[in-house]
Amino acid sequence: MAVQQNKKSRSRKGMRRSHDRVAVPAVVYCACGEPTAPHRACPSCGTYKGRQVTKQDNE
């Protein structure tokens, strides 16, 4: 088991962990008003860049 040789300061520990944060997911809103991921078809209406790209079952 690895054991540290010297104590790491709070500052150095914080600098090491500075890149460990969770990225906030990017959200854009479709013309229908639903949130969706950028560069992907809208899961609710099936449009992408103003075109219908997937079939949607309207029940």
From Swiss-Prot:
SUPFAM superfamilies: Zn-binding ribosomal proteins
GO cellular component: large ribosomal subunit
Chain positions covered by the region annotation Disordered: 1-20
GO BP, one annotated term: translation
Pfam families with a match to the protein in the record: Ribosomal_L32p
Transmembrane segments: none
InterPro entries noted in UniProt: Ribosomal_bL32, Ribosomal_bL32_bact, Ribosomal_zn-bd
Family according to the record: Belongs to the bacterial ribosomal protein bL32 family.
Protein's UniProt name: Large ribosomal subunit protein bL32
Species for this entry: Nitratidesulfovibrio vulgaris (strain ATCC 29579 / DSM 644 / CCUG 34227 / NCIMB 8303 / VKM B-1760 / Hildenborough) (Desulfovibrio vulgaris)
Higher taxonomy: Bacteria, Pseudomonadati, Thermodesulfobacteriota, Desulfovibrionia, Desulfovibrionales
